[in-house]
Amino acid sequence: MPEIVNIISREIVDSRGNPTVESEVHTKSGFFGLASVPSGSSLGSQEALELRDNDHARFFGKGVKKSVNIINSTIRVSLLNIDVTKQSVIDEIMINLDGTNNKSQLGANSILSVSLAIAKAAASFMGMPLYQYIARLYGMSSNVYSMPVPMMNIMNGGKHADNNLDIQEFMIVPVGAKNIKQAIQMGSEISYSLKNVLNNLGISIALGDEGGYAPNLKSHSYALELINKSIEQSNYVLGKDVVLAIDCAASELFEVSTGKYVINSEKVSFTSEEFVDYLSSLARKYCIFSIEDGQSEHDWHGFSYLTKKLGDIMQLVGDDLFVTNPNLLKMGINKNVANSILVKPNQIGSLTETLNVIKLAKESGYSTIVSHRSGETEDTSIADIAVGTSAGQIKTGPVRCSERTSKYNRLIRIEEFLKDNSKFYGVNEIKNLSAQLWMYQNKNMNI
């Protein structure tokens, strides 16, 4: 029988050495699910609360014993003997048990670890892979799954690194690949080429939190030039095989007192409109098709201007802006702000809510990108979520560090298993990509 007979939680460590939560769910019939949750460093102010101990005698206050104890007592007792296949019912029980808007009583980390473990136990009970079970929960009718195109963060800055770059992520996107396996190969080759480019210039190859290189460079343009050079040295073509994407994490750059965006590495500051012009110039020159958090989460006027200026030719992603929250996404839809959402399950705190946000975004014409966090674990749930919802895109770092490659390896296995029942999202299906490619190819024209 699929009734829950036990839930066990423990404190483990993530890729930064910080504690996080892992949970097991066991059923009467002997099936079980195991899941752990990640943690971010650059946080949106309205993310669901990650419960920490704040006991500075352990892990500088970052321990999660409170969360573990809540799962092993309160949550466990509330879910015993419930059918493990009742995902939405179980998630609702935990959300109501918490009783707050931001999950501050039980903690989003507590609820999500159990929520994902529930799904894995249910998938095991039903004899299907997790992505197929998620597709069933999501209501996907097609038997053909879209494999997500990876957005690979190969150079880190901002809060993800101890260097001088203000832009937080510089990503390569292998849109010209035929399948996920080739996309991963391209990402690996370009990353190694970038290492050689940096080495030959005597530039540090130290790594940031997400495994990308974290050099000190004279400007963001120079960073993009080096990435372009690494693409060329890998025998790929920018604007054909590969395009670029950036995460500005602009909330970290926004100076509230002046209302300006401060780029310390280039010793300049911009108004909202000037920052849009700056980003537009970079995009046109370096074939950047996607800009994440190109304005502060508090600067809705700036985000509206960004969307008005670039929304028809680029993918404009809301991360801190939306924090995987349906109410904030609805506000963005109503105000015509951004055209894409980054989906981080731990920002909202349950699988059911995550799937509902993806559905809302897609129904509203927003593209969806399922994403990791800077502090990751070996859990591969986001790969299954990306496939099970045919999200289209995934962010899970460079092809380096096992907490990142575990997701890539999971995608390789899924694609191999699905064979003809999968298609790679690729160049023809990404929002506004064709328009951006045209702009890049005609960048010298006066248009």
UniProtKB/Swiss-Prot annotation:
Keywords of this entry: Cytoplasm, Glycolysis, Lyase, Magnesium, Metal-binding, Secreted
Q: Which reaction does it catalyse?
A: (2R)-2-phosphoglycerate = phosphoenolpyruvate + H2O
The active site lies at 210, 344
Query: Any idea which positions bind (2R)-2-phosphoglycerate?
Result: 168, 344, 373-374, 395
Instruction: List the pathway annotation.
Output: Carbohydrate degradation; glycolysis; pyruvate from D-glyceraldehyde 3-phosphate: step 4/5
**What SMART domains does UniProt report for this protein, alphabetically?**
Enolase_C (SM01192), Enolase_N (SM01193)
Q: Please provide, in alphabetical order, the Gene Ontology terms of the cellular component aspect for this entry.
A: cell surface; extracellular region; phosphopyruvate hydratase complex
Q: Which EC class, in a word?
A: lyase
| BP GO terms, sorted | glycolytic process
Record's InterPro entries? Enolase, Enolase-like_C_sf, Enolase-like_N, Enolase_C, Enolase_CS, Enolase_N
Extract the GO molecular function terms from the UniProt entry.
magnesium ion binding; phosphopyruvate hydratase activity
- Positions bound to Mg(2+): 247, 292, 319
- Where does it localize? Cytoplasm; Secreted; Cell surface
EC number(s): the record gives 4.2.1.11
Free-text remark on how the cofactor is bound: Binds a second Mg(2+) ion via substrate during catalysis.
What cofactors does this protein use? Mg(2+)
Subunit structure, per the record?
A: Component of the RNA degradosome, a multiprotein complex involved in RNA processing and mRNA degradation.
Biological role stated in the UniProt entry: Catalyzes the reversible conversion of 2-phosphoglycerate (2-PG) into phosphoenolpyruvate (PEP). It is essential for the degradation of carbohydrates via glycolysis.
Q: Which family does it belong to?
A: Belongs to the enolase family.
Its protein name is: Enolase
In which organism is this protein found? Blochmanniella floridana
Question: Which gene is the coding source of this polypeptide chain?
Answer: eno
